[in-house]
Amino acid sequence: MIELKEVVKEYRTKNKEVLAVDHVNLSIRAGSIYGVIGFSGAGKSTLIRMFNHLEAPTSGEVIIDGDHIGQLSKNGLRAKRQKVSMIFQHFNLLWSRTVLKNIMFPLEIAGVPRRRAKQKALELVELVGLKGREKAYPSELSGGQKQRVGIARALANDPTVLLCDEATSALDPQTTDEILDLLLKIREQQNLTIILITHEMHVIRRICDEVAVMESGKVIEHGPVTQVFENPQHAVTKRFVKEDLNDDFETSLTELEPLEKDAYIVRLVFAGSTTTEPIVSSLSTAYDIKINILEANIKNTKNGTVGFLVLHIPYISSIDFGKFEKELIERQVKMEVLRHG
C-alpha cells in the first residue's frame, strides 16, 4: 500500500511562492497500476518525484509499505530507492555504455558481483525483448528500444514500485502501445505496483486500474478508470475524455438545423454488458419512435468496455421521454440531453 497524506510542495523565489502540489491525498493498492493525468503545469511531475524523495515535500507524508519516506536515514532512503525505481520520458541512458552495461549500471552501484550483475542484466534484456542487442549503443536504438533499456535498468534491483514519468510521450502510437503491453506483462510477472503520469487519456485507459486527475497542483477527481471515463465530473476530466474519443460533435451541433418541437439530441453512455445489448432498437419499438444514430464510439479500458452513442429523436412526448429516461437508468445507461426542440 502507498499513501500520500496532505502532501504539499511549495517553491519559494524572491518574488513569489509557487504551490506545485496542493494538499494531495492518495491511496494506491499494492500490485495495481495507478495513473496520474494532467495538462502541463498541473503538478504531476513534481508529485511523482516525491514518491522516491527526489523532491522532498514541504509538508505531508509519503508512506510506502509502512515506511515514512521523509523519516528514513540516508542509508535507509538509499535502500528504499532501490525498491522504488523510475523510468523517464527521455530515457536517461549512458551513451558511452552498451545496452547490457546500461542495465548493469545500478547493480554495479549496489555492489553486486560482476558475474551476477551480468547474468541478471542478460535476463532483463530477454524480458524486455532486446535479445541480440546487448552490445548496441543507445545511438543505434529506436526510441522504443531505448525505453526498453530504461525499463530493464529500472528493474535491475528487483523493485516493488515502478514510477513512470511520461514514459511514452516521446514515442509514436504503435511503440507507445508496445511499451504499455510490456509494462502490463512485467506487472503480472513481478507483481509490481506501477505509478505513471501522462497527459494522454489513451495511456490511462489502456493499462491503469485507477486514475487521479490533477489541475493546479490539486487532485480534482479520482477513481477506477472505467468509472471516471464513463462519468467524468470535472471540466478537465471531460476534456481528456473528449479528446480520447476524438469527439467534436458538440461543435457540429451549432451547425444543425433548429430542432422541431419535442425533438431531442441525446448522448448515451454504456458500460460493461450493456454495450452489447440492443437497447436502442428495443426502446424504439417500445415507444414507437424513430431514433437516428448520429455518432457511435466504443472504447476499451483495462477493466471493461465503455460505449457512447449520440441519438436524434425527431419526436417524443414529454411524458414518454420521462419514461424513456427512467428505463435507461434502470438499464444502467447514462443519458445527457445535448439539445431539445
From Swiss-Prot:
Pfam name, any one: ABC_tran
Single GO MF descriptor: ATP hydrolysis activity
The ABC transporter domain, residue ranges: 2-241
UniProt entry keywords in alphabetical sequence: Amino-acid transport, ATP-binding, Cell membrane, Membrane, Nucleotide-binding, Translocase, Transport
Membrane topology: Peripheral membrane protein
Catalytic activity: L-methionine(out) + ATP + H2O = L-methionine(in) + ADP + phosphate + H(+); D-methionine(out) + ATP + H2O = D-methionine(in) + ADP + phosphate + H(+)
GO cellular component: plasma membrane
Cited PROSITE patterns: ABC_TRANSPORTER_1, ABC_TRANSPORTER_2, METN
Family membership: Belongs to the ABC transporter superfamily. Methionine importer (TC 3.A.1.24) family.
Functional description taken from the UniProt entry: Part of the ABC transporter complex MetNIQ involved in methionine import. Responsible for energy coupling to the transport system.
Name of the protein in its database record: Methionine import ATP-binding protein MetN 2
Organism of origin: Staphylococcus aureus (strain MRSA252)
Taxon lineage: Bacteria, Bacillati, Bacillota, Bacilli, Bacillales
UniProt gene name: metN2
